[in-house]
């Protein structure tokens, strides 16, 4: 039956040739090492899949070449052997040298006979040999020219691939994260991040990798091979350095300007860009720097009071978001913080997950960062590397030394921002800070209509309304909406209070708190109420007082709806719902929800003694 025959033809089995992709020498040289690795992975995987299906066909030459580590466009020299079986319609023969006098390679030529043109599937060519045709490149003719840079190509494929560099076209988009790529090989490699596929496994320790090159570098750890110095071959010894520093405390890459330590030279080089001022376009009025001249120009227009046209609103918004969306595309889903690279984001996320993968073998303490573990191990080794030139105190961290030295420099005058009360050690820092209050504020809170100059400030502010507190203290479990609040809180546990009052000796963890405390001795009250003229030593006290005139009560209880003028009053009130009594008498164990109630109770014990 004719219809049956036609049906059988349409169900012909798939062959390796249907899935294979072949490159000429010129096209192969265009590929990067990562793309070549990807090509090898895909071809070998396709071959294994077909074999696993039980399909019978000859081993393709391209697979043999790839397994031997040779370039897939090369063809092995033809051995003297018997002609292939009658089922194959392919022959491999060496062309006479005069047919290609500039190429010294053997060329596999497929000879198609009249019988091969028959419509039946069986008479097709089953031999998957890699064809390398005599190239136009030998004659020196490259008819295809790039109009942008004048570079010539012998194939339209190569020209199109090259032109994407000039046009910036990235036609291949990842469906998971919308990241775009110029070449399909790049997107295939990228998608392994989402799929978690790691096809290259170490046969010694079982660790898997996305790329073959990474596996080869990893194998050097087991082989114990000498790795070149970081400065000479950083890209080749990076994996070894990471692994080595888990076991060896030494050779820490340290920034000479700020003392920050890194476990990789590449991380240090990236960090140094902060100090070397890579933002070449700096505006003198506010001190801000910009990488792009176009953004710098728009920023100057805002200072000049020039109105940005309606059609340039998007550009103005991108200016405000430059440090977040343009330069920091990676966002934390928990707290909204933005990062310029995925690796700092992954490190940051450990704050929320409490993941601490690095363990100290001596005291079983765990750490989020390898660099922190390395610094911690110095405590066990008795190392104290940083000495104060004022009092000879030694610290094992440069950051601790800087913090300590503030004790000696505390007498320097602090400059306060009249808008928010924040303190600064110099007028230059205060001036830069004051731009926050004067600049355009396009980000508005939909709850209270407060406006902000940066999206990150808005995200932090909105936590007041949502009650979200993503930063938790590991010591006592107390949670905070801002990371800086957690950092300050941790000083309670470490008892690190470098700021001491000259009058009474009381110490503080923050310079701003010391400045506020010193007003008790001086009697200074710089904050005056415009309504009644009452003066206060702290701005927060003035804000709370002003609410008595306005009747504003922004803090509302979720349980009963009662509102309060201060957050502390709300916290005290909420204890009536939770029955929480954190203030306990050390003598009789009786507990209270308010500290004032505890003080009154403790007076009864003192009266009994009397």
UniProtKB/Swiss-Prot annotation:
It comes from the Eukaryota. Residues 119-139 are annotated as: Disordered. The keyword Transcription applies. One of its GO terms (cellular component) is nucleus. A zinc finger (C2H2-type) spans 144-166, 172-194, 200-222, 253-275, 281-303, 330-352, 358-380, 386-408, 415-437, 443-465, 471-493, 499-521, 527-549, 555-577, 583-605. This is Zinc finger protein 667. Keywords: DNA-binding, Metal-binding, Nucleus, Repeat, Transcription, Transcription regulation, Zinc, Zinc-finger. May be involved in transcriptional regulation. InterPro entries: KRAB, KRAB_dom_sf, Znf_C2H2_sf, Znf_C2H2_type. Belongs to the krueppel C2H2-type zinc-finger protein family. Residues 119-129 have a biased composition (Polar residues). Gene3D superfamilies: 6.10.140.140, Classic Zinc Finger.
